Amino acid sequence: FLLSFDGGPSIVPGNTEALATFLRKQKQAALFFVLGQNLQTRRDKQSMQALRDLYRGQCVGTQGWQYRSHAQWKDWEDSVIRGVARAQSDLPEQYVPLFRPPYGQRRADSPAFFASQNLRVTLWDIDAQDLGPLTAEQSAQRTLTLMLLWRRGLIQLNDSQPKALEVVTWLLTNTAQSGIGWEDCRDFAGQ
């Protein structure tokens, strides 16, 4: 299984720091899908080195410049290009050429564009549903149940949600002696 986080980075200081620090302590390398505008906001408020240290040991893909459905949006390609450029420029060591479309929605004519940009569209298999009304423990139990059913997959959590850290902590604690394996994001990304 691989942990992935959407919609970051959070505001300074925020959930992103807590998640990334916890993952490093657990020797886990997760996949963070960032928004270009959020990365720009971070860049404006902290040093470039602090931003790079934030994602040290993790992988960073993109969700474009802003979190907006691509299904009906004319400027979606520009959003992707700008988001990739910001992530590559700011986080060259952590950047991986993976793109997660906001809401999982993309246009039928998008595959050629993504191929031309050398981006692999990366969805998820298991949604922790940490944005909804579930408690952190309910979200974690739901995730574990789906993990046991699917036996492998990409788990989606939301970077900006305080519940995400609680869910990850619960999952790692409750699977520690189970034999469940956690994939390194660099292996997944082919890096």
Language-model regions, residue ranges each:
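His/Asp/Glu-enriched short active-site or ligand-binding loop at hydrolase and phosphoryl-transfer sites
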Residues: 105-148, 180-191
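Soluble non-cytosolic domains of exported or imported proteins
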Residues: 10-17, 74-78, 104, 134, ...
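Divalent metal-coordination and catalytic microenvironments
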Residues: 6, 23, 60, 99-102, ...
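Active-site-proximal loop/turn and secondary-structure-junction residues that shape catalytic pockets
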Residues: 9, 36-38, 66-68, 103-105, ...
